[in-house]
Structure formats: C-alpha cells, structure tokens
C-alpha cells in the first residue's frame, strides 16, 4: 500500500493530513480500514508466499506499528516500515514482551525453587561418565552396590525314550547286521518275523509255482515295509 506524506494529525480513530487545504486520510503500509471504523494489519510472508494476519486495532497508527514490528522480524533491519526506529516511540509488542521477561528473570523469588530452571544449572555441575570398557565399575561406584540377581529356576530334564520300531519295519540296506553261515542260511542278529507272503507284489502272479510247498525254489525279492 502507498504511504502518504505531509503533516499528519491524529483525530479520533483516523489519521488525517492537510494537503492544499483539504483533509485526506493517510494510508499506511499493511493497514486497511474496516467498514465499521477499525483498522486491520497484515503482512506478506516472503517464505510461505502467503499473507499473515496481525490483528485489528482501534487506530491506524497502532496497526502500522504492528506491521513494522512484523516486517523487522521477517526481513530484518532493512525492511520497509511506516515509522523509523525511534527511542521515544513505544517499542513493538514483541520487544516489550522480551524486556518484561528479562526483568522478571532478574528478580529472585524466595518461594521458587531455582534448581528447576536452566539459569541456575551452573550451581550443580554435571559429571561426565566415561564411555570405556570399565563402565560397569564406574556405574557401580555412582549408583551403589548392585542388587543380588535371582538365578532362574532350573528344571530337570529326563532323557527321552527311543521310539519303538515295529517288528514288521526292517531295512534291506547293506548296513543291516546279519551273519552268513556255511549252509547259505542267513541268521540275523535281531529277532525277525517271517514275512506273511513269499511273493513280490510288484510282479504279476505266478501260476506255475507252488507258493507253499516249493518255497525253496522261489527266487524273488520280498517287499518289506
């Protein structure tokens, strides 16, 4: 917005100026007049690319000073403002708040525990603990003796019994223990049960062979499960 120049005077909630005998209202940067007579202040944030609402004020001068304070915070001392920085003028709201906060911090309250604040942390030095392999002994010296640790209760374990293998299930591999005598009879070290059938289920039935009387002449492999 444009800022008018000339001698200004405050008349109620509006700021007017006399130019060539005519009264004209001065317009400040970042200030707009509402239809009901109050003045609104806003500023454009250069980082967010959006307008920031500063509030509504009773006079245009108050709204202009609020804009100046926000402009200095966003753009620094080189910001374009409505009023120059003057020691006689009241400080902006944020500067006034910082001064009041500093004054309150300098006052000592007898009913306040100052150990809870960061300004008094120098009274309580912090001991830096070494981060070496001897950390266990260092921690023990700071925190006192270690509490006795409870050993977990041990449960008795009994040996598992080997699984019982059925007598019908035998292995036909070469590693099975067996003894061959001179009569070509195979005597197994373990007690085996005679197979129920003397024929192989993988071959077709033999009609010309007596399965019961001529068992010695039958040459076939036994199917053992």
Swiss-Prot record:
InterPro entries: AP2/ERF_dom (IPR001471), AP2/ERF_dom_sf (IPR036955), DNA-bd_dom_sf (IPR016177)
Induction of its expression: Induced by jasmonate (JA), ethylene and Alternaria brassicicola (locally and systemically). Moderate induction by wounding or drought stress does not require EIN2, whereas induction by NaCl does. Transcripts accumulate slightly in cycloheximide-treated plants, a protein synthesis inhibitor. Seems to not be influenced by ethylene, exogenous abscisic acid (ABA), cold and heat stress.
Entry note about domains: Contains a slightly degenerated ERF-associated amphiphilic repression (EAR) motif, which may be involved in the activity of transcriptional repression.
Keyword Transmembrane helix assigned: no
SUPFAM superfamilies: DNA-binding domain
Keyword annotations: DNA-binding, Ethylene signaling pathway, Nucleus, Plant defense, Repressor, Transcription, Transcription regulation
Self-association state and partner proteins as the record states: Interacts with SAP18.
Function comment: Acts as a transcriptional repressor. Binds to the GCC-box pathogenesis-related promoter element. Involved in the regulation of gene expression by stress factors and by components of stress signal transduction pathways and could also regulate other AtERFs.
Residue ranges flagged as DNA-binding region: 27-84
Motif (EAR-like (transcriptional repression)): 199-205
Localization of this protein: Nucleus
One GO cellular component term: nucleus
Protein name: Ethylene-responsive transcription factor 3
Gene: ERF3
GO MF term list: DNA-binding transcription factor activity; transcription cis-regulatory region binding
Family: Belongs to the AP2/ERF transcription factor family. ERF subfamily.
Biased composition (Low complexity): 132-143
Region ranges (Disordered): 127-197
Biological process (GO), any one: negative regulation of ethylene-activated signaling pathway
């Amino acid at each position: 917005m444009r800022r008018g120049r000339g001698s200004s005077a405050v008349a109620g909630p509006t700021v007017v100026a006399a130019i060539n005998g005519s009264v004209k209202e001065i317009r400040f940067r970042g200030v707009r007049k509402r239809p009901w007579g109050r003045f609104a202040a806003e500023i454009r944030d250069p980082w967010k690319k959006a307008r920031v609402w500063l509030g509504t004020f009773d006079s245009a001068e108050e709204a202009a000073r609020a804009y100046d304070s926000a402009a200095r915070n966003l753009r620094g001392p080189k910001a374009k403002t409505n009023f120059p920085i003057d020691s006689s003028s009241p400080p902006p709201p944020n500067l006034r708040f910082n001064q009041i906060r500093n004054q309150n911090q300098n006052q000592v309250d007898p009913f306040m525990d100052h150990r809870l604040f960061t300004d008094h942390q120098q009274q309580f030095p912090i001991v830096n603990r070494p981060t070496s392999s001897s950390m266990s002994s260092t921690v023990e010296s700071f925190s006192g003796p270690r509490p006795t640790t409870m050993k977990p209760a041990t449960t008795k374990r009994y040996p598992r019994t080997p699984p019982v293998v059925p007598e019908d299930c035998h292995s036909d591999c070469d590693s099975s223990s067996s003894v061959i005598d001179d009569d070509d009879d195979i005597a197994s070290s373990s007690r085996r049960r005679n197979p129920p059938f003397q024929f192989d289920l993988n071959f077709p039935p033999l009609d010309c062979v007596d399965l019961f009387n001529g068992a010695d002449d039958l040459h076939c492999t036994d199917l053992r499960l």
